[in-house]
Amino acid sequence: MTRELESKYIYAVKELAEEFFVLTCGEHEGPRGVNRIIERSLRSTIMPKNKELYLRGLAACGVEYQDNNGEISFEGVSDKEINFLSKVPNLIRPKFDLIVKKIFPKLDQVDINYHAAKSICDTRFSPTINFNSLFDLVKKDSDKRKLIQISFEKMMNEIILKAESEGLKNSFFLHISPNLGNKNGKETIKLSTQDDIGSTDIQLLIKGAVKDSGVLFLLNKFIADKTGKAPFGRNFNFRNSPNSITGKIDLCKKTIQKDDMPLIIGVGDTVTSKKHNGKEIYLRGGSDRSFLEFIQILGNEFGIKNKIIFVDSSSGEVERPSTKKTGLKGISDIDDNLKFDMVFENGPKEYISWFIELASKRSNFKKKLTI
């Protein structure tokens, strides 16, 4: 709740104008939203709207669209779904107390309340249980971390069953970050080990709200703004998106002219690859993997050299494999189809410096074209 962004980065986004979109499983609005980070960073709640400095793009993994002045829309979501989502934090709270008391029997209620406030995220479209606060209590005890992960995954599945009992059978799914891929429509939790913290949060998301579907939505919007014609239709949203990457590629090939397809730079920090039971079989996942793979394949199909960038966030708030220490181990593998064009080993600060320079050069280049 105290995070800030470098103001130069916010203005660099503004310089890129219609060529920049954010695509995140966080949210724009609310006390924990990115809009509050923008306002804190600029020391103003008025300037971001007046100067159109909010981050344009999709949040809640593809549900919540926002333009630069903070106007928000969320097509494809029913009132019944929103009403249920609003109840989820209150459904989680008593279950949270029971789980924490079982794992930490010596913890008093004051401390439980403290960790509940940090762990239960009452975001509008993506109520979340985050483990980091509880992980701090167990330090390097990977068995305790596993117990936390397994207990809360079970709890979140109970929330899904509650939704189904209220007539919302095909409305929601659990997004686990980071994960080890998708099996039978469910994301596989990445259990903690001694050298990898594993999954750190579980979100209840609206079914269909995945980042690769978000790419389609943003692509449709970009081309519509550029040409006046939306290839997938003006009312396209995540619920209209094909489920598979192949289906998404086929839709693009059928409806988008090659001259209208832009070069896309995809940036992510959550990609995983782990050997399965010590065999030469890898479980590949991470909340950024699918949309980065989609961008890469899309470029290949249209003969465009799309770029894939990986930002190493291992030195941040979450323990993750470090490219500096172990290369791409735990992130990618020799047989991985996803290939990175750039890796920022020094993390977000290095990436932000590069981004600011890129935005300046791109802006100057476009100005020269108009002279």
Please report, for each region that a protein language model flagged, where it lies by residue.
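Well-ordered, non-membrane alpha-helical segments in soluble/globular domains
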Residues: 3-10, 34-42, 81-104, 141-167, ...
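A short acidic, often aromatic-flanked loop/helix-cap motif at beta-alpha or helix-coil junctions
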Residues: 63-68, 128, 316-319
